[in-house]
Each structure stands twice: as structure tokens, then as C-alpha cells.
Amino acid sequence: MVLNPRGFGAGTIRRATAFDDPWLRETGAEVYAAFGDFRSILPSWLHHPGVLTFVEEDKHHEPRGFILLGFYEPSDMPPVTYVADLLAIAVAPAHQNKGIGTRLLSYAVDLATTAGLRTAVSEMRLTVAHTNVGALKLFARHGFEVLDNHHGAYDGGQRAIRMRRRFRRST
């Protein structure tokens, strides 16, 4: 459990448990409704062995946001090189614009960077809708750059933009 990482407001970021599944599904479906049927996608990610799920909660243990971070070996990189993929980042609507998304993203980047120092995780990638201007700005502030400006489309019709942040490797 990590208490108050990076000094943002009172709260905790912790690993999700099976008890969080209903909240994760409902919140994900609500936050991502414009992009497609997240409710049908999320269960396969929640229980995939290569995906880590973290929940941000307030001091009363009420969840406010979550991240899903997957790790995989991409076909476009040398063998035994891994990528951390931010599969989802969501903040419940009642808690948006309060720094929670920034906090969750910082946590994910720190986690992937730490993994990269110990393993062959060379970068973090994510996909975002071209209409999600706030998220695009947030990701750019955290060092993400556009990798593919036309990475397909969401079920809602939005163009998908693939972004990445490379990690420095110590030699």
C-alpha cells in the first residue's frame, strides 16, 4: 500500500481486490461510455495474470479512481524487451479535476520505471481518444509522445492515438 504518493491530497493507492470488481466495472463503464462497451472489455483485463490493477481511495476507503497496467513483449521491439501498457486510467466523475488522475498516472509511471530498472521494461505505452484533450495534455506533461496518430478507432468512432514514454536504462 502506498500512502499519499507524490504529496497529492489525502488518500491511498492500493492493489485492487475481487471486492473492487463491481465498482471498477461500473466506474469504467460510466467514464468510458462514449468510447464503447467498457463493461464487456474490463473483466478480461481484471483477471489477466499480466495486468495489475490499482485503486485510489480517500481516507474513508471510498474508491475514486483506478489504473490498469499490463506488461507484454511487443512484436516491434527486440526479443526480451517488455512494454508497460496503461490499459485504463479512470476517475469517478464526482472526483474528476481534483488531481486524482495526475496522481494515478504518476503512480503508474513510477511503478513502470521501477520495473524497468530491474527488468527489460523499456517504455510505457497508452492509447487515448483524439477527443480527450485533457488526457492528451496530462500525458504530454508526463513525458508521453505520440507514437501513432491513427492507431485505429474506438467503438464510439473516436480516432485512437498511441503514445509512449521511454525509460532511461542504467548501464
Locations of regions flagged by a protein language model:
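Acyl-donor (CoA/ACP) binding surface of acyl/acetyltransferases
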Residues: 98, 102, 150-151, 157, ...
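A short beta-turn/loop motif at secondary-structure boundaries
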Residues: 44-48, 131, 153-157
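Conserved short alpha-helix immediately C-terminal to the canonical SAM/SAH-binding motif I
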Residues: 104, 132-135
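Conserved catalytic-core motifs of GNAT/GCN5-like acyltransferases
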Residues: 125-128, 140, 145-162
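Acetyl-CoA-dependent GNAT
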Residues: 2-11, 15-96, 102-118, 166-168
